[in-house]
């Protein structure tokens, strides 16, 4: 595991957490477990029930929907949060392209962090709205 300072700096780069205080970043860090995944690991399987969200600390991953590549993600990306909010199935698959370090946060811990840091709710809504707009632009032009 990286030093506490560099780990918190990595979390600060996550768009969702960019306005969080150091104290809030420490809460987020404590809410999850760090995992190291080799290249080629299936992180999220489309259609499966989501039980956790993943924050990419280092490395890259590809998002595929129905087998079609829709995005490449890197440090600072959060994936899997949608299923945690609506208890629905995963909407895409995510596979690591390189060795990755991720913070894994369970549904219970994810919701507790949102409750403990109210500003995250607004930021999360803005992030999801941005994704909807991007999909709308891609689909309708």
Where are these regions (language model features)?
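Cytosolic regulatory regions built on CNB/CRP/Popeye-like sensor folds
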Residues: 1-141
